[in-house]
Protein backbone atom coordinates (compact mmCIF):
# COMPACT_ATOMS: atom_id res chain seq x y z
CA UNK A 1 0.00 0.00 0.00
CA UNK A 2 2.83 2.38 0.87
CA UNK A 3 4.52 1.59 -2.44
CA UNK A 4 1.35 2.33 -4.37
CA UNK A 5 0.94 5.69 -2.62
CA UNK A 6 4.59 6.54 -3.35
CA UNK A 7 4.16 5.65 -7.06
CA UNK A 8 0.99 7.76 -7.25
CA UNK A 9 2.79 10.75 -5.71
CA UNK A 10 5.65 10.50 -8.21
CA UNK A 11 3.17 10.28 -11.13
CA UNK A 12 1.35 13.36 -9.90
CA UNK A 13 4.63 15.29 -9.70
CA UNK A 14 5.59 14.30 -13.27
CA UNK A 15 2.18 15.37 -14.61
CA UNK A 16 2.50 18.71 -12.84
CA UNK A 17 5.95 19.36 -14.33
CA UNK A 18 4.73 18.35 -17.80
CA UNK A 19 1.75 20.71 -17.54
CA UNK A 20 4.00 23.58 -16.49
CA UNK A 21 6.33 22.96 -19.43
CA UNK A 22 3.42 22.94 -21.88
CA UNK A 23 2.04 26.19 -20.51
CA UNK A 24 5.48 27.81 -20.63
CA UNK A 25 5.97 26.72 -24.24
CA UNK A 26 2.54 28.03 -25.25
CA UNK A 27 3.17 31.39 -23.62
CA UNK A 28 6.64 31.60 -25.16
CA UNK A 29 5.54 30.63 -28.67
CA UNK A 30 2.51 32.92 -28.66
CA UNK A 31 4.43 35.94 -30.04
CA UNK A 32 5.74 33.83 -32.94
CA UNK A 33 2.26 32.61 -33.82
CA UNK A 34 0.87 36.13 -34.02
CA UNK A 35 2.61 36.79 -37.33
CA UNK A 36 1.38 33.54 -38.85
CA UNK A 37 -0.40 34.22 -42.11
CA UNK A 38 0.66 37.90 -42.19
CA UNK A 39 2.36 39.24 -45.31
CA UNK A 40 4.85 42.11 -45.12
CA UNK A 41 5.75 44.33 -48.09
CA UNK A 42 9.16 43.78 -49.71
CA UNK A 43 11.42 46.83 -50.06
CA UNK A 44 13.64 46.82 -53.18
CA UNK A 45 17.10 48.32 -52.64
CA UNK A 46 19.69 49.47 -55.20
CA UNK A 47 23.41 50.32 -55.23
CA UNK A 48 24.20 53.51 -53.35
CA UNK A 49 20.68 53.85 -51.98
CA UNK A 50 20.29 54.51 -48.24
CA UNK A 51 17.02 53.50 -46.58
CA UNK A 52 15.97 54.29 -43.00
CA UNK A 53 13.03 52.31 -41.65
CA UNK A 54 11.50 51.04 -38.41
CA UNK A 55 10.15 47.69 -37.19
CA UNK A 56 10.79 44.34 -38.83
CA UNK A 57 10.98 44.65 -42.61
CA UNK A 58 11.76 42.53 -45.68
CA UNK A 59 14.37 43.66 -48.23
CA UNK A 60 15.52 42.35 -51.63
CA UNK A 61 18.59 43.35 -53.64
CA UNK A 62 18.50 42.82 -57.44
CA UNK A 63 21.86 42.28 -59.15
CA UNK A 64 21.49 43.55 -62.73
CA UNK A 65 25.17 43.39 -63.79
CA UNK A 66 26.46 40.19 -65.38
CA UNK A 67 29.80 39.31 -63.72
CA UNK A 68 32.88 39.42 -65.97
CA UNK A 69 36.63 39.74 -65.64
CA UNK A 70 36.25 43.38 -64.58
CA UNK A 71 34.44 42.23 -61.44
CA UNK A 72 37.36 40.02 -60.39
CA UNK A 73 37.91 41.90 -57.13
CA UNK A 74 34.48 43.54 -56.88
CA UNK A 75 32.42 42.92 -53.76
CA UNK A 76 28.73 43.62 -53.21
CA UNK A 77 27.78 44.26 -49.59
CA UNK A 78 24.64 45.42 -47.79
CA UNK A 79 25.36 47.26 -44.57
CA UNK A 80 22.73 47.37 -41.81
CA UNK A 81 23.31 49.42 -38.68
CA UNK A 82 21.34 50.92 -35.81
CA UNK A 83 21.73 52.39 -32.34
CA UNK A 84 20.23 49.26 -30.75
CA UNK A 85 20.61 45.53 -31.26
CA UNK A 86 19.13 43.85 -34.33
CA UNK A 87 19.09 40.47 -36.08
CA UNK A 88 19.38 39.80 -39.82
CA UNK A 89 18.14 36.66 -41.60
CA UNK A 90 19.35 36.11 -45.19
CA UNK A 91 17.29 34.02 -47.66
CA UNK A 92 17.32 33.43 -51.42
CA UNK A 93 14.06 34.92 -52.72
CA UNK A 94 10.63 36.30 -51.84
CA UNK A 95 9.15 32.85 -51.27
CA UNK A 96 11.63 32.20 -48.47
CA UNK A 97 10.70 35.55 -46.95
CA UNK A 98 7.06 34.51 -46.85
CA UNK A 99 7.99 31.27 -45.14
CA UNK A 100 9.68 33.27 -42.39
CA UNK A 101 6.26 34.62 -41.42
CA UNK A 102 5.01 31.13 -40.56
CA UNK A 103 6.05 29.43 -37.36
CA UNK A 104 8.43 26.48 -37.49
CA UNK A 105 10.86 24.76 -35.18
CA UNK A 106 13.75 25.65 -37.47
CA UNK A 107 12.77 29.30 -37.30
CA UNK A 108 12.78 29.10 -33.52
CA UNK A 109 16.25 27.54 -33.51
CA UNK A 110 17.61 30.20 -35.86
CA UNK A 111 16.13 32.92 -33.69
CA UNK A 112 18.28 31.82 -30.75
CA UNK A 113 21.37 30.99 -32.82
CA UNK A 114 21.60 34.34 -34.60
CA UNK A 115 23.58 36.96 -32.76
CA UNK A 116 22.28 40.45 -32.09
CA UNK A 117 24.60 43.29 -33.12
CA UNK A 118 24.44 47.02 -33.70
CA UNK A 119 25.95 46.67 -37.16
CA UNK A 120 26.19 43.81 -39.62
CA UNK A 121 27.26 43.35 -43.24
CA UNK A 122 25.65 40.99 -45.76
CA UNK A 123 27.90 39.72 -48.57
CA UNK A 124 26.02 39.26 -51.84
CA UNK A 125 27.31 36.84 -54.47
CA UNK A 126 27.94 38.27 -57.93
CA UNK A 127 26.16 35.30 -59.50
CA UNK A 128 22.92 35.68 -57.50
CA UNK A 129 20.33 37.69 -59.37
CA UNK A 130 18.39 38.38 -56.19
CA UNK A 131 19.24 38.26 -52.49
CA UNK A 132 16.60 38.83 -49.82
CA UNK A 133 16.86 39.30 -46.08
CA UNK A 134 14.78 40.25 -43.06
CA UNK A 135 15.78 42.68 -40.31
CA UNK A 136 14.37 42.20 -36.79
CA UNK A 137 15.27 45.07 -34.42
CA UNK A 138 15.13 44.47 -30.69
CA UNK A 139 12.72 47.40 -30.36
CA UNK A 140 10.00 47.97 -32.95
CA UNK A 141 10.33 51.76 -32.80
CA UNK A 142 14.06 51.73 -33.38
CA UNK A 143 15.25 53.42 -36.58
CA UNK A 144 17.87 51.47 -38.55
CA UNK A 145 19.63 52.08 -41.87
CA UNK A 146 20.11 49.75 -44.85
CA UNK A 147 22.67 50.67 -47.54
CA UNK A 148 23.98 48.41 -50.37
CA UNK A 149 27.31 49.15 -52.09
CA UNK A 150 29.45 47.77 -54.93
CA UNK A 151 33.17 48.55 -54.63
CA UNK A 152 36.69 47.31 -55.28
CA UNK A 153 37.77 45.20 -52.30
CA UNK A 154 41.44 45.66 -51.51
CA UNK A 155 41.34 42.74 -49.07
CA UNK A 156 40.36 40.34 -51.86
CA UNK A 157 43.30 41.55 -53.94
CA UNK A 158 45.70 41.14 -51.00
CA UNK A 159 44.43 37.59 -50.41
CA UNK A 160 44.94 36.81 -54.09
CA UNK A 161 48.45 38.31 -54.05
CA UNK A 162 49.36 36.36 -50.90
CA UNK A 163 48.15 33.14 -52.54
CA UNK A 164 50.24 33.74 -55.68
CA UNK A 165 53.39 34.52 -53.67
CA UNK A 166 52.84 31.53 -51.38
CA UNK A 167 52.36 29.20 -54.36
CA UNK A 168 55.50 30.27 -56.23
CA UNK A 169 57.74 30.59 -53.15
CA UNK A 170 56.55 27.41 -51.41
CA UNK A 171 59.85 25.60 -52.08
CA UNK A 172 61.89 28.43 -50.57
CA UNK A 173 59.61 28.88 -47.56
CA UNK A 174 59.55 25.16 -46.75
CA UNK A 175 63.35 25.29 -46.26
CA UNK A 176 63.45 28.61 -44.41
CA UNK A 177 64.03 28.65 -40.66
CA UNK A 178 62.45 32.09 -40.34
CA UNK A 179 59.24 30.80 -41.90
CA UNK A 180 59.36 27.73 -39.64
CA UNK A 181 59.42 29.76 -36.43
CA UNK A 182 57.05 32.52 -37.60
CA UNK A 183 54.46 30.03 -38.91
CA UNK A 184 54.71 27.97 -35.72
CA UNK A 185 54.22 31.00 -33.48
CA UNK A 186 51.31 32.29 -35.59
CA UNK A 187 49.60 28.91 -35.55
CA UNK A 188 50.06 28.66 -31.80
CA UNK A 189 48.56 32.09 -31.16
CA UNK A 190 45.59 31.61 -33.49
CA UNK A 191 44.68 28.00 -32.71
CA UNK A 192 45.93 27.61 -29.15
CA UNK A 193 42.64 26.06 -27.97
CA UNK A 194 42.66 23.55 -30.83
CA UNK A 195 46.24 22.57 -30.01
CA UNK A 196 45.39 22.20 -26.31
CA UNK A 197 42.44 19.93 -27.11
CA UNK A 198 44.62 17.89 -29.46
CA UNK A 199 47.22 17.39 -26.69
CA UNK A 200 44.49 16.29 -24.27
CA UNK A 201 43.16 13.92 -26.92
CA UNK A 202 46.59 12.27 -27.19
CA UNK A 203 46.62 11.46 -23.49
CA UNK A 204 43.06 10.12 -23.30
CA UNK A 205 42.73 6.32 -23.13
CA UNK A 206 41.03 4.45 -25.93
CA UNK A 207 37.27 3.92 -25.75
CA UNK A 208 36.99 6.73 -23.28
CA UNK A 209 33.64 8.53 -22.77
CA UNK A 210 35.55 11.81 -22.93
CA UNK A 211 35.73 11.54 -26.73
CA UNK A 212 32.35 13.25 -26.93
CA UNK A 213 33.79 16.02 -24.79
CA UNK A 214 36.73 16.35 -27.17
CA UNK A 215 34.42 16.65 -30.19
CA UNK A 216 32.44 19.31 -28.41
CA UNK A 217 35.68 21.05 -27.46
CA UNK A 218 36.73 21.30 -31.12
CA UNK A 219 33.43 22.95 -32.02
CA UNK A 220 33.66 25.28 -29.04
CA UNK A 221 37.22 26.25 -29.99
CA UNK A 222 36.19 27.11 -33.54
CA UNK A 223 33.35 29.21 -32.20
CA UNK A 224 35.71 31.05 -29.83
CA UNK A 225 38.17 31.76 -32.68
CA UNK A 226 35.37 33.11 -34.85
CA UNK A 227 34.07 35.25 -31.98
CA UNK A 228 37.54 36.68 -31.28
CA UNK A 229 38.12 37.67 -34.91
CA UNK A 230 34.68 39.25 -35.06
CA UNK A 231 35.39 41.39 -32.00
CA UNK A 232 39.12 41.87 -32.58
CA UNK A 233 38.90 45.65 -32.76
CA UNK A 234 37.08 45.86 -29.43
CA UNK A 235 39.58 43.52 -27.78
CA UNK A 236 42.59 45.52 -29.02
CA UNK A 237 40.97 48.78 -27.89
CA UNK A 238 39.50 47.92 -24.49
CA UNK A 239 41.56 44.89 -23.41
CA UNK A 240 44.92 45.59 -25.04
CA UNK A 241 46.91 44.57 -21.94
CA UNK A 242 45.30 41.11 -21.96
CA UNK A 243 45.97 40.80 -25.70
CA UNK A 244 49.66 41.67 -25.22
CA UNK A 245 49.98 39.16 -22.38
CA UNK A 246 48.32 36.44 -24.43
CA UNK A 247 50.58 37.09 -27.43
CA UNK A 248 53.70 37.10 -25.25
CA UNK A 249 52.91 33.90 -23.31
CA UNK A 250 51.48 31.83 -26.17
CA UNK A 251 54.11 33.12 -28.60
CA UNK A 252 56.93 32.13 -26.24
CA UNK A 253 55.47 28.65 -25.71
CA UNK A 254 55.03 28.19 -29.47
CA UNK A 255 58.60 29.33 -30.10
CA UNK A 256 59.89 26.91 -27.46
CA UNK A 257 58.03 24.01 -29.07
CA UNK A 258 59.34 24.93 -32.54
CA UNK A 259 62.87 25.27 -31.15
CA UNK A 260 62.58 21.91 -29.38
CA UNK A 261 61.71 19.99 -32.54
CA UNK A 262 63.66 22.21 -34.93
CA UNK A 263 63.00 22.84 -38.62
CA UNK A 264 62.38 20.03 -41.09
CA UNK A 265 65.46 18.15 -42.27
CA UNK A 266 64.18 15.11 -44.13
CA UNK A 267 63.65 15.75 -47.83
CA UNK A 268 60.28 14.01 -47.96
CA UNK A 269 58.92 16.08 -45.08
CA UNK A 270 60.10 19.25 -46.80
CA UNK A 271 58.38 18.18 -50.03
CA UNK A 272 55.13 17.48 -48.16
CA UNK A 273 55.27 20.93 -46.54
CA UNK A 274 55.98 22.52 -49.93
CA UNK A 275 52.99 20.75 -51.51
CA UNK A 276 50.77 21.78 -48.60
CA UNK A 277 51.84 25.41 -49.00
CA UNK A 278 51.15 25.26 -52.73
CA UNK A 279 47.66 23.87 -52.15
CA UNK A 280 46.98 26.53 -49.52
CA UNK A 281 48.23 29.18 -51.93
CA UNK A 282 45.84 27.97 -54.64
CA UNK A 283 42.99 28.09 -52.11
CA UNK A 284 43.90 31.69 -51.29
CA UNK A 285 43.92 32.52 -55.01
CA UNK A 286 40.45 31.00 -55.35
CA UNK A 287 39.18 32.84 -52.27
CA UNK A 288 40.61 36.17 -53.45
CA UNK A 289 38.77 36.19 -56.80
CA UNK A 290 35.03 36.67 -57.09
CA UNK A 291 34.62 35.29 -60.63
CA UNK A 292 35.11 31.52 -60.57
CA UNK A 293 36.09 31.25 -64.25
CA UNK A 294 38.89 33.76 -63.78
CA UNK A 295 39.99 32.02 -60.58
CA UNK A 296 40.23 28.61 -62.26
CA UNK A 297 42.07 30.08 -65.25
CA UNK A 298 44.69 31.75 -63.02
CA UNK A 299 45.08 28.60 -60.90
CA UNK A 300 45.65 26.43 -64.00
CA UNK A 301 48.10 28.96 -65.45
CA UNK A 302 50.04 29.14 -62.18
CA UNK A 303 50.18 25.35 -61.88
CA UNK A 304 51.38 24.93 -65.47
CA UNK A 305 53.97 27.70 -65.25
CA UNK A 306 55.48 26.17 -62.10
CA UNK A 307 55.40 22.47 -62.95
CA UNK A 308 56.04 22.69 -66.70
CA UNK A 309 59.19 24.74 -66.18
CA UNK A 310 61.54 21.75 -66.37
CA UNK A 311 60.09 20.24 -69.61
CA UNK A 312 60.20 23.66 -71.29
CA UNK A 313 63.80 24.23 -70.19
CA UNK A 314 64.81 20.77 -71.43
CA UNK A 315 63.13 21.33 -74.80
CA UNK A 316 64.76 24.76 -75.09
CA UNK A 317 68.22 23.31 -74.39
CA UNK A 318 67.71 20.50 -76.93
CA UNK A 319 66.59 23.02 -79.53
CA UNK A 320 69.72 25.09 -79.03
CA UNK A 321 71.94 22.01 -79.19
CA UNK A 322 70.33 20.67 -82.38
CA UNK A 323 70.13 24.06 -84.07
CA UNK A 324 73.16 24.68 -86.35
CA UNK A 325 75.28 27.50 -85.05
CA UNK A 326 76.69 30.21 -87.26
CA UNK A 327 80.47 30.38 -87.22
CA UNK A 328 81.51 33.80 -86.10
CA UNK A 329 84.91 35.17 -87.15
CA UNK A 330 87.47 34.91 -84.41
CA UNK A 331 88.75 38.15 -83.04
CA UNK A 332 92.46 38.74 -83.54
CA UNK A 333 94.61 39.49 -80.52
CA UNK A 334 96.25 42.83 -80.00
CA UNK A 335 99.97 43.04 -79.38
CA UNK A 336 99.50 43.53 -75.63
CA UNK A 337 97.06 40.60 -75.41
CA UNK A 338 99.43 38.39 -77.38
CA UNK A 339 102.36 39.33 -75.13
CA UNK A 340 100.32 38.69 -71.97
CA UNK A 341 98.91 35.38 -73.22
CA UNK A 342 102.33 34.16 -74.33
CA UNK A 343 103.82 34.88 -70.90
CA UNK A 344 100.98 33.06 -69.12
CA UNK A 345 101.11 30.02 -71.39
CA UNK A 346 104.91 29.87 -71.19
CA UNK A 347 104.90 29.87 -67.40
CA UNK A 348 102.17 27.22 -67.41
CA UNK A 349 104.13 24.98 -69.77
CA UNK A 350 107.31 25.40 -67.71
CA UNK A 351 105.49 24.38 -64.52
CA UNK A 352 104.11 21.29 -66.25
CA UNK A 353 107.61 20.44 -67.44
CA UNK A 354 109.01 20.75 -63.91
CA UNK A 355 106.26 18.46 -62.56
CA UNK A 356 106.94 15.88 -65.24
CA UNK A 357 110.69 15.95 -64.59
CA UNK A 358 110.06 15.33 -60.90
CA UNK A 359 107.67 12.40 -61.52
CA UNK A 360 108.71 8.71 -61.39
CA UNK A 361 107.94 8.32 -65.11
CA UNK A 362 110.80 10.64 -66.04
CA UNK A 363 114.04 8.84 -67.09
CA UNK A 364 116.61 11.04 -65.35
CA UNK A 365 119.88 9.34 -66.38
CA UNK A 366 118.97 9.03 -70.00
CA UNK A 367 118.03 12.70 -70.17
CA UNK A 368 121.12 13.92 -68.29
CA UNK A 369 123.40 11.95 -70.60
CA UNK A 370 122.06 13.91 -73.57
CA UNK A 371 122.39 17.37 -72.00
CA UNK A 372 125.35 19.68 -72.41
CA UNK A 373 124.71 21.40 -69.05
CA UNK A 374 123.12 19.02 -66.49
CA UNK A 375 123.64 21.54 -63.67
CA UNK A 376 121.56 24.16 -65.45
CA UNK A 377 118.83 21.58 -66.02
CA UNK A 378 118.86 20.67 -62.32
CA UNK A 379 118.61 24.35 -61.37
CA UNK A 380 115.63 24.72 -63.72
CA UNK A 381 113.84 21.81 -62.03
CA UNK A 382 114.49 23.40 -58.63
CA UNK A 383 112.80 26.63 -59.78
CA UNK A 384 115.47 28.72 -61.49
CA UNK A 385 114.62 30.58 -64.72
CA UNK A 386 115.00 28.63 -67.93
CA UNK A 387 116.88 31.51 -69.59
CA UNK A 388 119.95 33.43 -68.49
CA UNK A 389 120.01 37.20 -68.36
CA UNK A 390 122.34 37.55 -71.35
CA UNK A 391 120.11 35.21 -73.39
CA UNK A 392 117.12 37.38 -72.61
CA UNK A 393 118.95 40.56 -73.66
CA UNK A 394 120.17 38.98 -76.91
CA UNK A 395 116.64 37.77 -77.67
CA UNK A 396 115.22 41.24 -77.09
CA UNK A 397 117.87 42.81 -79.34
CA UNK A 398 117.11 40.44 -82.17
CA UNK A 399 113.35 39.84 -81.85
CA UNK A 400 112.14 42.76 -79.76
CA UNK A 401 110.62 45.97 -81.07
CA UNK A 402 113.30 47.75 -83.08
CA UNK A 403 115.42 44.60 -83.24
CA UNK A 404 117.45 43.45 -86.19
CA UNK A 405 114.98 40.71 -87.09
CA UNK A 406 112.10 43.15 -87.58
CA UNK A 407 114.30 45.59 -89.47
CA UNK A 408 115.45 42.86 -91.87
CA UNK A 409 111.90 41.74 -92.33
CA UNK A 410 110.70 45.25 -93.10
CA UNK A 411 113.49 46.17 -95.52
CA UNK A 412 113.66 42.77 -97.17
CA UNK A 413 109.95 42.88 -97.74
CA UNK A 414 110.14 46.23 -99.54
CA UNK A 415 113.01 45.13 -101.80
CA UNK A 416 111.34 41.82 -102.63
CA UNK A 417 108.10 43.62 -103.50
CA UNK A 418 109.97 45.90 -105.90
CA UNK A 419 111.74 42.96 -107.54
CA UNK A 420 108.44 41.11 -107.91
CA UNK A 421 106.89 44.18 -109.47
CA UNK A 422 109.79 44.54 -111.92
CA UNK A 423 109.74 40.86 -112.79
CA UNK A 424 106.07 41.01 -113.25
CA UNK A 425 106.36 43.35 -116.26
CA UNK A 426 108.33 40.74 -118.31
CA UNK A 427 106.50 37.69 -119.63
CA UNK A 428 107.29 35.02 -122.18
CA UNK A 429 105.28 36.91 -124.79
CA UNK A 430 107.34 40.03 -124.20
CA UNK A 431 110.68 38.31 -125.16
CA UNK A 432 111.76 39.63 -128.59
CA UNK A 433 112.76 37.04 -131.22
CA UNK A 434 116.25 37.17 -132.71
CA UNK A 435 116.35 38.90 -136.11
CA UNK A 436 119.05 37.94 -138.64
CA UNK A 437 119.84 39.66 -141.90
CA UNK A 438 119.53 37.93 -145.28
CA UNK A 439 123.23 38.39 -145.91
CA UNK A 440 124.05 36.39 -142.87
CA UNK A 441 121.66 33.67 -144.02
CA UNK A 442 123.22 33.57 -147.47
CA UNK A 443 126.66 33.41 -145.96
CA UNK A 444 125.66 30.55 -143.84
CA UNK A 445 124.02 28.85 -146.78
CA UNK A 446 127.23 29.00 -148.75
From Swiss-Prot:
The knockout outcome noted for this protein's gene is: No discernible effect on morphology, viability or fecundity. Simultaneous knockout of nemp1 and nemp2 results in viable healthy animals but both females and males have impaired fertility with females laying normal-sized clutches only for the first 3 weeks followed by a marked drop in fertility.
Topological relation to the membrane, as annotated: Multi-pass membrane protein
Location, primary (coarse class): nucleus
Q: Does the keyword Nucleus apply?
A: yes
Q: Which InterPro entries match?
A: NEMP_fam
| One example of a Gene Ontology biological process annotation | erythrocyte enucleation
The record ties this protein, via Pfam families, to:
NEMP
Positions of the region Disordered?
410-446
Signal sequence extent:
1-37
**Keywords assigned by UniProt, alphabetized:** Erythrocyte maturation, Glycoprotein, Membrane, Nucleus, Signal, Transmembrane, Transmembrane helix
Q: Which residues are glycosylated?
A: 62, 118, 129, 441
Task: Provide the transmembrane region boundaries.
Answer: 154-174, 181-201, 209-229, 239-259, 269-289
Q: State its location(s).
A: Nucleus inner membrane
Q: Which family does it belong to?
A: Belongs to the NEMP family.
Job of this protein: Contributes to nuclear envelope stiffness in germ cells. Involved in male and female fertility. Essential for normal erythropoiesis. Required for efficient nuclear envelope opening and enucleation during the late stages of erythroblast maturation.
In its UniProt entry, what is this protein called? Nuclear envelope integral membrane protein 1
Organism equals Danio rerio (Zebrafish)
Q: Which gene encodes it?
A: nemp1
Amino acid sequence: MAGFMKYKSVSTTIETVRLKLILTAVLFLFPFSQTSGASRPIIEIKDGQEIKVQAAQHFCYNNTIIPGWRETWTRIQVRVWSTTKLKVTVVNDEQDLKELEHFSIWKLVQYFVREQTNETTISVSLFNNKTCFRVDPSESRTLYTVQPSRHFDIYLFLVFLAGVLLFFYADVLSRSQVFHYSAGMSTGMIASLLILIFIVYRFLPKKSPFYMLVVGGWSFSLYIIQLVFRNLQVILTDHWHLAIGYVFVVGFISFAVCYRYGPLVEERSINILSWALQIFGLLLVYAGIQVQQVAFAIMIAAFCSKNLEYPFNTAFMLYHKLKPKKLEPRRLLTEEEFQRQSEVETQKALEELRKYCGSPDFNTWKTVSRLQSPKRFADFIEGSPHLLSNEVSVHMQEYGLGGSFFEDELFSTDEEDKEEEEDGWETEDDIKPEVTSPRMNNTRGK
